[in-house]
Design a protein with these regions (language model features):
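Amphipathic alpha-helical segments
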Residues: 16-40
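Intrinsically disordered, low-complexity regulatory regions enriched in serine/threonine/proline
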Residues: 7, 15-20, 46-236
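Generic recognition of long tandem-repeat/solenoid scaffolds
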Residues: 39, 43-47
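N-terminal amphipathic/basic-hydrophobic helices that include classical n-h-c signal peptides
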Residues: 1-13
């Protein structure tokens, strides 16, 4: 009982910034050795050409514990601006119907949110790094800090080792995905935009069919996709 009270006292007096600070202290050197810089209290960033690599530490606090979620993001202004320019035309098209109970402000907020997104690709589920021959339980036993709850970081065995492993994973992920070919294979609107910029019209048509067929198989609406395809082909 005394131990529980001690933990609750610690949580009460610790803030999210304290947890973030401890994490930053562990991983900072490893990131800085590879050109990343701490650009915000919870974000390491590295610019490479037109791309921006982001490692984000998201911490939330409840009455009983902290929750940690590590996220990776790839931003590319050239690509996101191109996609968002087309998306603005799509979302203003009369064929796009919003629920009747949506106010003008809600619709405008949706429009702004959708068309100001700078992220080209991202990772939130770090089970991506599980080896094919590795069981999920084995992977989780060795690396689970990416999405975890705790009263203090210290209660989690090997928390520092796992954080350093997350840095290694992050670096390998950015090296893997920051290529047009990878993005074309693993994205939708970004892929269509990149193929159009490459003047690969056959590729655009094939990718569009792939996305369309997938959405139909999942019984998802295709109106927005069809409009994106239409306006994309009008781009010069």
């Amino acid at each position: 009982m005394e131990e529980i009270l001690v933990f609750r006292t610690i949580i009460k007096h610790m803030e999210k910034k304290d947890v973030v600070g401890k994490i930053v202290d562990v991983i900072r050197t490893s990131f800085e050795q590879d050109g990343f810089k701490l650009k915000a209290p919870n974000k390491f960033e590295k610019r490479k050409g037109d791309s921006l690599y982001i490692y984000e530490i998201s911490v939330t606090k409840s009455k009983t514990h902290f929750s940690l979620h590590l996220r990776l993001k790839l931003q590319n202004k050239r690509i996101s601006t191109g996609v968002n320019t087309i998306l603005k035309r799509v979302l203003k098209d009369p064929l796009i119907k919003y629920p009747t109970n949506f106010t003008d402000k809600v619709i405008e907020d949706i429009f702004k949110g959708r068309t100001s997104n700078k992220d080209v690709y991202g990772l939130t589920d770090w089970r991506f790094f599980k080896a094919d021959e590795q069981t999920l339980s084995d992977f989780n036993a060795k690396f689970s800090i990416w999405f975890s709850n705790f009263e203090t970081l210290e209660e989690k065995n090997n928390w520092q080792t796992e954080l350093l492993q997350s840095v290694a994973y992050a670096k390998s992920w950015f090296a893997l995905i920051d290529h047009d070919a990878y993005l074309i294979k693993h994205t939708d609107y970004v892929a269509l935009y990149l193929l159009k910029k490459l003047d690969d019209i056959e590729g655009v048509e094939a990718k569009y069919k792939e996305i369309y067929d997938r959405k139909r198989s999942l019984d998802q609406d295709t109106e927005e996709l069809e409009l994106f395809y239409k306006y994309l082909l009008q781009e010069h």
